[in-house]
Amino acid sequence: LTCVTSKSIFGITTENCPDGQNLCFKKWYYIVPRYSDITWGCAATCPKPTNVRETIHCCETDKCNE
């Protein structure tokens, strides 16, 4: 499985997930209007939001967390 790990104006960076990590995730942490801190990566299980400002999307196909 290949997941996106970062995005910039120059394109995306990906990584091949290690064995046992069969999900890609994208996590948004709302900071202020029009600005969120976004994290991408691989996971064995879908992470759970830690507070109401956090949204997490998990998926199972290559680069699906773009």
Curated annotation (Swiss-Prot):
Pfam families, sorted: Toxin_cobra-type (PF21947)
InterPro entries assigned: Snake_3FTx, Snake_toxin-like_sf, Snake_toxin_con_site, Toxin_cobra-type
Keywords: Disulfide bond, G-protein coupled acetylcholine receptor impairing toxin, G-protein coupled receptor impairing toxin, Neurotoxin, Postsynaptic neurotoxin, Secreted, Toxin
GO molecular function: toxin activity
Record-level GO cellular component terms: extracellular region
Family statement drawn from the similarity comment of this UniProt entry: Belongs to the three-finger toxin family. Short-chain subfamily. Aminergic toxin sub-subfamily.
CDD domains reported for this sequence: TFP_snake_toxin
UniProt name for this protein: Muscarinic toxin 4
Keyword Disulfide bond: yes
Tissue: Expressed by the venom gland.
Cellular compartment(s): Secreted
Keyword Secreted carried by entry: yes
Known role: Binds to the muscarinic acetylcholine receptor (CHRM).
Source species, domain of life: Eukaryota
